[in-house]
A protein has these predicted regions:
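Extracellular/periplasmic periplasmic-binding protein-like sensory domains
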Residues: 246-322, 396-400
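Venus flytrap/periplasmic-binding-protein-like
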Residues: 81, 128, 135-138, 210-211, ...
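Extracellular/periplasmic Venus flytrap/periplasmic-binding protein
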Residues: 86-90, 135-138, 143-250, 292-297
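Beta-alpha junction/loop-to-helix N-cap segments that form part of ligand/metal-binding clefts
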Residues: 48-54, 66-139, 149, 207-216, ...
Length: 402
């Protein structure tokens, strides 16, 4: 009797030990749930991007309604960081240490993601598909647990420089940039292509802080430089202000705008559609306002999703299209995990995406990653605002980055 009790206790201990060991290997994952964390700017100067978080909440609700992943429901915990790095650190630590998420997904912005990058890599928590085009997310040697998604700002700067050289070879360039890695990556990209012409062609570069109320004074300074080309590397609030201000000043440079601020709802409409005519931006996702995609199967899929899961949302807002793209990539990555949702395998699958086509990406643009290639999207196409919508022109261009 005593021997049986001892054996039973040993067996129970073995089961408990195995369960604890499995739980330790797959934090945030149980037999019924996969817990994912996100910090998002639902308030503050970049609150227009809050639509991305809302879009992902809806996307994962659909995933759950359709049965989840490998028999598990997604528990997506998205919290506000106000676009404040200290708040992002606080919220990220809470999600990792208290909520015990399996991985962090699509955190917003260069400053906030920079603030948590070392912490997440030290903890070996995947920091996946960062919502920022900073080049620093593609550094697998130093930060293997961090990977971006969209084309890097530096690559986009290179694309814009190529366009300027081809169309305004004698142009005088003025630049407005956010005073952080986001803005400085554009300067680096322009310099990559312009080379020794940079100092001659760039007649003025002026920065702004995310805490500035307006950029009106910067616009006046840039106009006074005599430039006939303007590159604006700014988030939506400041991009809209710039479009409006240069129109009011009567300044008409060739204006190139970062692709993070191409939303009709959060940039063009506040600025005034008529004020943005001729504006050029790069794109990798399909534009919801472009009639060319009215009958596109991918956009039909997106519209059906929006109608069912976000019926009251503004469907002219490109942030919802971006959110759907992020959701689709994450879904594919989770499917590739099979039944192994350890953090190591989650990272492995995120860095082994092959020729992935998404319903919301422009034709010809695909996603590829590898353990040495942390630039998932490296292609873009230019588009011009015609007063009512964005019009694509030219060929798909692949930038630098491997």
């Amino acid at each position: 009797m005593h021997r049986r009790t001892l054996l039973a206790s040993a067996a129970s201990l073995a089961v408990v030990t195995h369960v604890r060991s499995a739980a330790a290997e797959t934090p945030g994952v149980t037999a019924t749930e996969i817990k994912i964390g996100q910090t998002e700017a639902y308030s503050g100067p970049a609150s227009a991007y809050g639509a991305i978080g809302f879009g992902l909440v809806a996307f994962f609700k659909r995933v759950n309604d359709q049965g989840g992943i490998a028999g598990r429901k997604i528990n997506f915990i998205s919290v506000d960081d106000g676009y404040s790095p200290p708040k992002a650190v606080e919220q990220t630590r809470r999600l990792v240490e208290q909520e015990g998420v399996a991985f962090m997904l699509n955190g917003l912005g260069t400053p906030s993601n920079t603030a948590v990058q070392k912490y997440l890599n030290q903890k070996k928590v995947p920091q996946l598909f960062v919502s920022s085009g900073a080049d620093k997310w593609a550094n697998p040697k130093e930060f293997p647990w961090t990977i971006g998604l969209q084309p890097s700002y530096r690559t986009e700067g290179q694309i814009y420089a190529k366009y300027i050289l081809a169309n305004k070879p004698d142009g005088k360039i003025a630049i407005l940039y956010q005073n952080d890695d986001f803005g400085k990556d554009y300067l680096a990209g322009l310099r990559d292509v312009l080379g020794d012409k940079y100092d001659r062609m760039v007649v003025k570069a002026v920065s702004y802080e995310v805490t500035d109320p307006t950029i009106d004074s910067q616009a006046v300074t840039l106009q006074g430089s005599g430039a006939d080309v303007l590159v604006t590397a700014a988030t939506p609030k400041f991009a809209a202000q710039m479009i409006r201000k240069i129109y009011d000043l009567g300044w008409k440079p060739l204006h190139l705008l970062t692709d993070v601020s191409i939303s009709v709802a959060s940039v063009i409409t506040p600025a005034g559609p008529e004020r943005a005519v001729g504006l050029i931006a790069a794109a990798y996702g399909k534009d919801v306002s472009d009639p060319a995609f009215k009958d596109d199967p991918g956009m039909k899929e997106w519209r059906a999703f929006m109608k069912e899961y976000m019926p009251d949302a503004d469907t002219t807002d490109a942030n919802y299209v971006y959110a759907y793209s992020v959701g689709c990539v994450t879904l594919q990555m989770l499917k590739q995990c099979g039944d192994d949702f350890s953090r190591a395998n989650i990272l492995k699958q995120a860095t082994n995406l092959q020729n992935l086509q998404l319903p919301t990406l422009l034709p010809g643009i695909v996603i590829n990653t590898s353990p040495t290639n942390y630039h998932p999207i490296r292609q873009e196409q230019l588009q011009r605002w015609n007063g009512t919508r964005w019009e694509l022109f030219g060929d798909v261009i692949e930038g630098a980055g491997s």
